[in-house]
Design a protein with these regions (language model features):
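Short S/T/G/P-rich N-terminal loop/turn motif that feeds into the first structured element of a domain
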Residues: 1-69, 76-92
């Protein structure tokens, strides 16, 4: 069953947002588990929302553990973070 992880990040400044996203772009392909889909949206001048869909809840948990390493290394750019995860609802 597909599961999703949704992460909203608010950054300290525009420069912090640029630096964080640049680091993420380089780091993510080498470290994050394969996702069915992954979309990042700029939700405000200093915020973004990432939604990734994974094959199972186990992969979501692995993704959470892995991304925490990146977040810990880049906390100086972040003002706040809110994360959600759950089963994908199929409406077909």
């Amino acid at each position: 069953m597909a599961y999703s992880r949704i992460v909203n990040v608010e950054y300290k400044s525009e420069k912090d947002m640029e630096m964080f996203l640049s680091k993420w772009k380089d780091w993510m392909p080498e470290h994050m588990p394969v996702a069915t889909s992954r979309t990042m949206v700029k939700t405000g001048p200093l915020s973004s929302l990432l939604m990734a869909v994974y094959a199972s809840s186990q992969v979501v948990e692995n993704a959470r553990e892995v991304v925490e390493v990146f977040f810990d290394e880049n906390r100086d750019h972040m003002l706040d973070i809110i994360a959600f995860h759950g089963e994908v609802i199929e409406l077909n």
